[in-house]
Amino acid sequence: MASESAAMDILDSAEASLNVASTALVEKEKKVQPATDETTPEKKAKMEIDAEMKDLTNDIPNSRKSQEKDPDALEDAKDPEADSSIELLCSPTPAEATDVDAMASKTESDNSVELLESPLKSPSSNDVNDEELLPLEEKEKPGPAKELEPKESEPDSKESSKSEALADSSIELISSPTSDDSLAKEKEVEVKEEHGQQAEAQVLQEIPRKADDSFKLQDDIAMEEDVPVPRSKAMQESKETQKTSKTTTKLEPLVDSIKDAIEDCINCNCKRLKKQYVLACVAILNFYKVPRKLKRSQYVCLDCYDTAVEMYEEYAGLLLAKQPLLLREFKQEQADFVTLDSSDEEEDEKTPEKPEFSKNVLDLIENELEDAIKKTLNKVEFSNQFNWSKTILQAKIERLAKKFEEVDLQLAQVQGLADKMHCSVYNSCQVVHKQLPPLDLHQNICPSDYKRLQQLPAAGDIVRPPIKIGETYYAVKNKAIASWVSVSVMEICDTTTGGGVTVKAYKIKYQHMPYPMMKTVAAKHLAYFDPPTVRLPIGTRVIAFFDGTLVGGKEKGVVQSAFYPGIIAEPLKQNNRFRYLIFYDDGYTQYVHHSDVRLVCQASEKVWEDVHPASRDFIQKYVERYAVDRPMVQCTKGQSMNTESNGTWLYARVIEVDCSLVLMQFEADKNHTEWIYRGSLRLAPVFKETQNSLNADCAIHQMRVPRRTEPFIRYTKEMESSNMQVDQQIRAIARKSTSKSGSPASTAAPPTGSSSSSAVRHLNNSTIYVDDDTRPKGQVVHFTAKRNMPPKIFKSHKCNPGCPFPMMHRLDSYSPLSKPLLSGWERMFMKQKTKRTVVYRGPCGRNLRNMAEVHNYLRLTNNVLNVDNFDFTPDLRCLAEYYIESTIVKEADISKGQEKMAIPLVNYYDNTLPPPCEYAKQRIPTEGVNLNLDEEFLVCCDCEDDCSDKESCACWQLTVTGVRYCNPKKPIEEIGYQYKRLHEGVLTGIYECNSRCKCKKNCLNRVVQHSLEMKLQVFKTSNRGWGLRCVNDIPKGAFVCIYAGHLLTEAKANEGGQDAGDEYFADLDYIEVAEQLKEGYESDVERADLDHEDDNYGPDAEDDDDFRPNNYYQKKKEKLRSSRSNSSSTQNTELDSQERTVISFNPNTDLDETVRENSVRRFFGKDQTPFIMDAKTTGNLGRYFNHSCSPNLFVQNVFVDTHDLRFPWVGFFASSHIRSGTELTWNYNYEVGVVPNKVLYCQCGAQNCRVRLL
């Protein structure tokens, strides 16, 4: 019965519209059809039929009431063969039936036939007096007496059958005219069609005029907002007709008050003046453009409901009046809003299922509904609306085009007038323009550098004028590495070398000598007296003035300022403040201005052949690879590193950095300072990079955790544009050297035919060149918690589990920081002077000002939220989400449901997908990896306070002990997690609570072991393959995810890396990192003994294996000192040729960094090496993190399921506040040169980029 009542409600709504449509159709036919003689037989027959149908249609309301009062009687009276449902669908209200009868009595016979061709109404009136309708009346409305007398059931059935027969005969009379009247009716139909076509043509002709009049009328009163636009006469008539046919329906509100109600009006612009609501039907939802929700009830207030109904009535009035709909502008306020709802609705929020239709109703709908709709639309001539709309729109377009032309004409006139005014203003005073010479502006140039730049010569080819007799030059006195002095050329002569080759020699005379001194030298040992007239390129042989005042340490005051031979290591450029970097032959380095450089008269084609043997190899490799890359240490003031000095590696600290030079102060002797080139092999980081490239014949490149905070190596590429011949030769050599094995110490030529096979493989092959303007760009959308209930007004109370609001919907699909705001919390901003602070207000109205108060509140109320759902950073946007509108390829979840949070994949560059990879949440051990996960070997705690007391928690003490070993004074509050935020890495590892602990699963010491909660997205980058970005803001220290994959041994990794690739390898070197952080441990540093009080101490060869003094230079140094002391009268004159102690660019000893004999790894077996995590074919989303030299993530080793130091979990934490839409990156810490014949340049674009990654 419930299904039948629901069907009747649906049919009632369509009943009124069909009746009004029939009434309007009658009015039109009265106007169109010509008058006929009422006395004709056809007319009389149809009048009788009209009277009969009038009696049938007047009994509907009372019959319906009887059906509602006695549904059982209705069920008994229903005949499955009778189309009673369609009759109910078309039955009008009593008021409408009266209007229709009144109209039908005045119309002609054809109008009556037309009216009754629609589906018949079910006869249900009690006022019918005809005797032949009494049985039908008794069937439709059984009285109380009849219901109590079961004996009268048979007469009732007979009467019902008679009524059905009568109803069928009535339908047959109306819908099927007799054959005698067929010819007359055909003629009348033809007349109707002719008049209808003429009327339609007249309407089409009048529509543009009416539309133009309507537009003009609207333009005249557009400025008056309160005065409505007058309607046409036809529209007013349609309104009156609509009012007469309108049915008054009393709506009973389903919700009496909004005070305690959860429901809200579906209209976002509702003023909430009414407190009564009704269920919103599909028509109301469509009117306010609100999507329908199948599992939830949607309500609308009475005001908004009446507004929608009135607007629909205006639409229906125009349709019934057969007027174009576009002549009336229906204004509806629209607001752009996004409803923030969960994808998973609460189970208990379900609308009770509506009863299904009965079989009779379904059969009726299938058979008659489509025909009824077509007939109804045909009666209102709905097909004409398309032609009318097209005509109206075309008229409007033409009118707007005319307006545009007028506006363009007015704009051109105004622009011309403005141009005339502009010219008249500026022509009043004539300005004299004077062309000045162009000025080359350089950014970030200080005044002194700019003045020096103006004094520099222009670039050009190097021209060496011939040596002339009598002119002054510089020449070597004793040795080529010593200082050069001024001489005069006395004579040019020819000499024969040992190979029988005749060369020119020059006899010179030294100036400023108390006695004449003559010598014959070659052109290579002569230099011009004046500075060069052009700028000098890389590798040019010169002598440069060395400033002795900059020398520190033991050589301070000994080395004097003079000209020394060397080569140009850096040209003049803005980065070095327009100075030359000079590599002197004896190993010293210094920056020199152009005025302090002299060009050597003759140089070899291979300039390193003229250099001292101690520096020859280094300068050769430097010149050859300068245009490719230069490895240099990136260091800052105060950093320390191992530095070689006189054959010993000592601990030195950075005092100052000057472009490519660094001033080092040795710890052994505070007075010993030295300027060293940042790419010199005497610096330990550069030396180790070179050694790794030499020893890695078949190595693999692995991502590793940084071992210490030491300076790192950055590879700089110099692309100097020059057309000089020497520079072109150097670049050719540099390019040719890239096809070699890449070993910087190897000088042997490659075998024949191996140049192509040993070519360096560049791995940067994923660049996509696109125009960013034509590609879709994402945007950050700021949501609002629309469905959130505001917190209560605070009243003094003790917080308990009843304070939070009950959860009305699931929050699994939302970001962690948005969950409180969707659960009745508020995040407020307080401003104190210029400082902004964040305060959370709980559902009970209590304000919480820090994480400690939030944690205490969550414990007291047993809230499902956790401390990682809150953050007090003012710049954090909790409800901001990154959104991309259009993509070419999109996947909903690459984890296939394994993660609690879905991980979508997008690609808006092309239709490619990432390489196939099986998703795995945790690491998977392989053959040879013995991973012991026995819980009995784990340390556990018995905390009951969510492990908030680090002093009493056993798991916390493991972490604290490791940190205190290196830094005993560090406060315990700053160690490890701080309310599940890790603000700085713990290199000794973090020990989390495990399954044996008695604490809760969401205690403060459980972070990495939880599944993914951040909303992340895999996307295709333009130059770095696939990457991963955050969809929402991530606070500093928040946990992102772990790095999972196959656990491999080093042997398996080397084997698989060469076959399948090694780009997803991560080294688990926790033991090496922790051991090198131990206090006082420096396996590779030799510290000098500063305590000279113990005279009995005598070191021997076994005490110091690394010390290998250079006896030759020691003796030479002592000889020089003795010679200087014996001849002190000649030290301060230019007569002596100063010879300094030779400093090699290459160290005189090896840096031994082998594994310590007492390493922890020896307890796990012989020849133990770090295990490797491979995410090539199996892994989680951590494999998509790209590298950056300035990353926003850092790596942390965490022990969860095992305390075996060889198998820590690798977790990623945010190193800073990351805004939504930002790519997530971490530092791979690749060792450059480890993999031979492979080059990978960094594309991160950071300011401290290393340029070369592999």
Swiss-Prot record:
Give the Basic and acidic residues compositional bias ranges.
Answer: 40-57, 65-81, 136-162, 182-197, 234-243, 1081-1090
Q: Which GO terms describe its molecular function?
A: DNA binding; histone H3K9 trimethyltransferase activity; zinc ion binding
> Which residues does the record give as Zn(2+) 1 binding sites?
C941, C943, C947, C953
Gene3D superfamilies the record matches: 2.30.30.140, Methyl-cpg-binding Protein 2, Chain A, SET domain
Record's compositionally biased regions (Polar residues):
172-181
Residues engaged in binding Zn(2+) 2: C941, C955, C993, C997
**CDD domains from the UniProt entry:** HMT_MBD (cd01395), SET_SETDB1 (cd10517), Tudor_SETDB1_rpt1 (cd20382), Tudor_SETDB1_rpt2 (cd21181)
Q: Where in the cell is it found?
A: Nucleus; Chromosome
Under which name does UniProt file this protein? Histone-lysine N-methyltransferase eggless
Query: Where does this protein hold S-adenosyl-L-methionine?
Result: R1024, G1025, W1026, D1062, Y1064, R1183, N1186, H1187
Q: Which family does it belong to?
A: Belongs to the class V-like SAM-binding methyltransferase superfamily. Histone-lysine methyltransferase family. Suvar3-9 subfamily.
Give the record's keywords alphabetically: Chromatin regulator, Chromosome, Coiled coil, Developmental protein, Differentiation, Metal-binding, Methyltransferase, Nucleus, Oogenesis, Repeat, Repressor, S-adenosyl-L-methionine, Transcription, Transcription regulation, Transferase, Zinc
| Stretches assigned to the SET domain | 1014-1229
Limits of the Tudor domain: 535-607, 634-691
Protein role: Histone methyltransferase that specifically trimethylates 'Lys-9' of histone H3 in ovary. H3 'Lys-9' trimethylation represents a specific tag for epigenetic transcriptional repression by recruiting Su(var)205/HP1 to methylated histones. Plays a central role during oogenesis.
Q: Where is the composition biased (Acidic residues)?
A: 1091-1106
Domain named Post-SET: residues: 1238-1254
State the source organism's domain of life. Answer: Eukaryota
